[in-house]
UniProtKB/Swiss-Prot annotation:
GO molecular-function term, one example from the UniProt record: DNA-binding transcription factor activity, RNA polymerase II-specific
All residue ranges annotated as the bZIP domain in the record: 226-289
Gene expressing this chain: MAFB
Origin species: Gallus gallus
Skewed-composition ranges (Low complexity): 54-76, 168-194
Gene3D superfamilies: 1.20.5.170
GO biological process: regulation of DNA-templated transcription; regulation of myeloid cell differentiation; regulation of transcription by RNA polymerase II
Gene Ontology cellular-component terms listed: nucleus
Biased composition (Basic residues): 157-167
Family: Belongs to the bZIP family. Maf subfamily.
Expression sites by tissue: Expressed in brain, thymus, gut, lung, mesenterium, spleen, kidney, ovary and bursa.
Protein name: Transcription factor MafB
Highest classification ranks of the organism: Eukaryota, Metazoa, Chordata, Craniata, Vertebrata
Region spans: Disordered: 35-78, 150-199
């Protein structure tokens, strides 16, 4: 911040404001040193302080170089607001130069509206007390006097990280509520006597192993073993019943075939008996014909009309 302050084109062009600004030579003012008591309250022990006569943007290589000494807030001094603006721009540029980029023109612009600085100081002092209480576990504490809430809007990244840290670590109330939910979910499971009654026999037999395991999630190991043994017993019983049914069906089929074969045998026997009777009848007839023909041949042997006569 060393150098001559120049009033840019963005400053007010009213003659009263320009005349008010030109009455001040900003480089003649020094930055007041912080008493050691304020550093002890903020948790910092510094052995070297910033020299009284230097207004420089380069931080001094001390253990507290990231937090420069703040000016005193005495309402009786005439240089208070100007020193506050210098200290604010210097300290916040060292700690977070990207969040608040104050230039000498910004300081002069803020000096023109210096009648609002007292209200801003009161508002930010209450905000800084709340901010210090909220971040008491951090390694270092930030103090930004005379900076409004709008100026701190750019430095939302550290607070965002802090909120994420709070979200990552569950509070004891959250952990206790989760444990209560787990206990409630365990209490909602029926006892071991009703676990077996939860599924019917048909459901246990028809259900696949994967589906049964999905339904048995959350139950104890003994309950799962007992239910699977029941399912295995029902499966074996069903298999035995199926085998018995198949054997009965096969027996009935064989009995029907046997009955049909017996009937066919009886029919064949009857057919054989009928054919035997026909055979006997034809045999008797043949014998009768043979005897009758022999007699006729003996009686007509002298007849010339017989074939033997011509031979």
């Amino acid at each position: 911040m060393a150098g001559e302050l120049s009033i840019g084109a963005e400053l007010p062009t009213s003659p009263l404001a320009m005349e008010y600004v030109n009455d001040f030579d900003l480089m003649k003012f020094d930055v007041k040193k912080e008493p050691l008591g304020r550093n002890d309250r903020s948790g910092r022990h510094c052995t070297r302080l910033q020299p009284a006569g230097s207004v420089s943007s380069t931080p001094i290589s001390t253990p507290c170089s990231s937090v420069p000494s703040s000016p005193s807030f005495s309402p009786t001094e005439q240089k208070t607001h100007l020193e506050d603006l210098y200290w604010m721009a210097n300290s916040y540029q060292q700690m977070n130069p990207e969040a608040l980029n104050l230039t000498p023109e910004d300081a002069v612009e803020a000096l023109i509206g210096s009648h609002q600085v007292s209200q801003q100081l009161q508002g930010f002092e209450s905000f800084r007390a709340h901010h210090h209480h909220h971040h008491h576990h951090h390694q270092h504490h930030h103090q930004y006097p005379a900076v409004t809430h709008e100026d701190l809007a750019g430095s939302g990244h550290p607070h965002h990280h802090h909120h994420h840290h709070h979200q990552a670590s569950p509070t004891p109330s959250t952990s206790s509520s989760s444990s209560q939910q787990l206990q409630t979910s365990h209490q909602q499971h029926p006892p071991s006597s009703s676990v077996e009654d939860r599924f019917s026999d048909d459901q246990l037999v028809s259900m696949s192993v994967r589906e049964l395991n999905r339904h048995l999630r959350g139950f104890t190991k003994d309950e799962v073993i007992r239910l699977k043994q029941k399912r295995r017993t029902l499966k074996n019983r069903g298999y035995a019943q199926s085998c018995r049914y198949k054997r009965v069906q096969q027996k009935h089929h064989l009995e029907n075939e046997k009955t049909q074969l017996i009937q066919q045998v009886e029919q064949l026997k009857q057919e054989v008996t009928r054919l035997a009777r026909e055979r006997d009848a034809y045999k008797l007839k043949c014998e009768k014909l043979a005897s009758n023909g022999f007699r006729e041949a003996g009686s007509t042997s002298d007849n010339p009309s017989s074939p033997e006569f011509f031979m």
